[in-house]
Amino acid sequence: MDTTPGDQPPAGDACRTRVVLDIVGDKWSLLVVRQLKDGPRRFTELKRAVDGISQRVLTVKLRSLERDGILTRTVHNVMPPHVSYALTEMGGTLREATAPLLEWSVAHLARIDEARAAYDARADTPTAP
């Protein structure tokens, strides 16, 4: 990939950029962000919607995303009290930026499974000395 000088972060920001890109590289964070695309959701709704995530991991991810300014946490003072999570403006732009990646993943899942199976079959076949 060709880059121009404007594509590169300033020298001191390179490490900080990597830290921010950890959000994009984390599967749980992207899946949580995706679930918030249509508006605020409660913890239990997110837990049901994000297949395979544990309660602890979801709690950690929500706190991390809130800390990074990707989402907001709102406590509703009703009976019974509950909490909802929603994307911030910045979170919305993250959702827009990563939506094509998630769509690509879904579109190519079967081909990736086939490639892995073919690779694993070759790896299990002994080679001649």
PLM regions with names:
Residues M1-G12, R67, T72, A86-P129:
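C-terminal regulatory/oligomerization modules of transcriptional regulators
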Residues Q35, K47, K61, R73, ...:
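Residue-level detector of alpha-helical recognition elements and their boundaries
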Residues P10-V57, R63, N77-V78, S84, ...:
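N-terminal helix-turn-helix DNA-binding core of bacterial DNA-binding proteins
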